[in-house]
Amino acid sequence: MLLLSRRAHFAVLATSLGVGALLTLGQLPAAYATPEPVKPSAPAPIPGRYIVTLTDKPIATYGGEVKGLRATRPDKGERVSVKSGRAKRYRAYLEEQQADAAARVGATPLKHYAVSLNGFATSLTPDQARTLKRAPGVLSVTEDRPRKLANNKNPIDFLKLSGSNGVWAALGGKKNAGRGVVVGILDSGYWPESKSFASEPLGTAQPTAADPFQPYRVGTDIKMKKADGGTFTGKCQPGESFTGQECNTKVIAARSFSTIYESQTAASQRTDFLSPRDGDGHGTHVGSTAAGNAGVSASVDGHSFGKISGVAPAAKLAIYKVAFTSKTEPEAVVYTGDALAAIDAAIIDGVDVINYSVSSSDTLDDPIDSAYMSAASAGIFVATAAGNAGPGAATLNHVVPWVTTVGASTVAPYAGTVVLGNGKKYAGIGTTVFGKVGSARLVTARSVKRASAAGGDADLCAPDTLSHAKAAGKIVVCDRGVVDRVDKSAEVKRVGGKGMVLVNLTENSTDGDTHAVPTVHLNVPFGPAVKEYAKKSRATATLREGTLSSTPSRYPQISSFSSRGPSVGTGGDLLKPDIAAPGVSVLAAVAPPSNENRKFDFYSGTSMASPHIAGIAALCFGVHPKWSPMAVKSAIMTTASRVKKANGKRSRDYLAQGAGNARPDRMFNPGVIIDSGEQDWLSFLAGEGFHTDAGVAAIDPSDYNSPSIAIGKLVGSQTVTRTLTAVKAGSYRTTISVPGVTATVSPSIVNFSSAGETKTVKITLTRKDAPFSKPIFGSVKFAGAGTAARVPVVVVAEKS
């Protein structure tokens, strides 16, 4: 099988050999009501670092207002020049004014700004700050404190978890976000030295009333009373490069399951730790995303990307290592037997949530998914990755109803822009572009290839295909495909290239990889346009940080790599994926030895989306510890928001996004939930033709009590039922809309006298003029008691 990895060009889902693949693409070719704003009073100055802005215009906008100094503002269509004599003279003038302003209060400029802002950074006392604010020529004095990423590049901000009106604040702060909940990570282990897992050592004292969920040691066991009233009991298993003392009050269990791996892999071929220590980085990334510590400063290759946090930072982690590397499988793989042993352990230990970012099959009888029925029956919410085989239809895995299958969506990108010598600008992803790179000659890779290299290989910037004499100092255009994306930039660096433009020649994802040289990744039609321009003899380009193009980024969208439905194993009678979450260019902790000594890195894949949902489930269990896994799933799905299409309009393609992008700010009070349990799952399987030997009646699979409605073959008319459970008493009005289909809900108003009461509704769908053999998307809404739950509908009309 081919592994779904950070570095593979493409991936094939396969489990015929009992091996699962980690669903990562990191380098693969992928509400609480907000109150009315109140104008705050100006805070009193405090000692610290400030930005002092002066009234004179900066170079970019200066029009010659100062006698003797000519204008530096560029003409329309021209770029700002900071190297001209007039710009240098005006900069000297500004810096002199800045020094004079600082000297008035006995301060010293630490850094000067003159191009987009006329000001300086300095350290000030409160009195100095107050004095400068009143000084002539001073526009403002602003405290230079660390700023939260508010532009949605950070999934935590995008999911509305952070901030004064965010989910964490509503829960009482980060210290309560997931408190009393244990998240199990079945993956490649973890890197215990990471700050994302740092915490106090475990003691032996019993928890007190002030902190009833404090974990503690009892002999070789680690115990923690949970929010649901149960007790988690785990172990910290010693092994290779892992003493067993690494567990703490954040990571309260760490075990390794390698029996099958060891039996299938000769000792001479093993490259991983036979212990919970992560030999790949995938598990560390996943665990820190789901429930890593809050406010961890993250830098990549010396560049700070602010602070990162796990979705449920107060939740505890239990690590179950099931994925291992070898010389024949350099990216970690999972053997079914090892995974099954780990699932057993997780159930026994008493985790509340499991994340499994590993491939499966598209059948209903996959052994891993079958084992997860037991986990779900035990009250464990299981989040799984949909797969990275998109954008084609029917490419997903984990199609069973008792797990939550997660697709990958985008957040605001770390943008970069390619500015061509002809003035055209093309925006893409530019994680490694800081400030400005160039101007420099822009060349195609083929034009700077070694004489002995094949042209097709050179187009891909394959290793040892480019010539140092030809490529040094230039920005090289490399085609996406076949060769790992980061290996392309490594080849450009090897020959002294100044930067790289990575181009998709067909529609595909653009990815925030950590490249060896400054790189902008462009999708079609921009990529081919840049490549065509690069063929000109005097082509030049500059790489710029940010978006300078007039084409805005639309987000969230479903990544092109994210696997799509319908689910083959159910004949399209169960919607999969269930939900979407951020999974593109996600920054989290990794294992340094296997990630070029980085402590943090950007990964992409449904592997990264799944732990966001696992963390969201942990938040929900923290508020509703007695809810079933399917109640949590329903709350997440029915409060989701539809993603966007490339044109910025909302998408109804539920086969790509499931119910939509998760909105944890809405999920705690969905109004109603659509719940299910083991008997429902067995009836579903019986309806699909499986012999369960459970003595349950078979149901039409479309009648399974899911928070979605899917009919893979609608011939004429069909009625399905859904049983609603009230989270909040009240009257709920139903509305339904399915284009080309006459749709009704009976009763149209559902009255609940108390929370916990259940009522059944019938939804009848009759084809009117819907096209045949094509999925039609609609929705049912249940609105009442100040809430609204939306249930996605997917039907395919057939003649017979």
Regions found by a protein language model. Name each.
Residues 35-150, 728:
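Inhibitory N-terminal propeptides of secreted protease zymogens
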Residues 177, 193, 278, 319-408, ...:
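Substrate-binding/access-modulating region of protease and related hydrolase catalytic domains
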Residues 264, 269-270, 525-588, 592-600, ...:
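Soluble metallo-hydrolase cores and metallopeptidase-like ectodomains found primarily
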Residues 337, 341, 347, 358, ...:
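Secreted peptidase-domain scaffold signal
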Residues 770-800:
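Terminal connector regions
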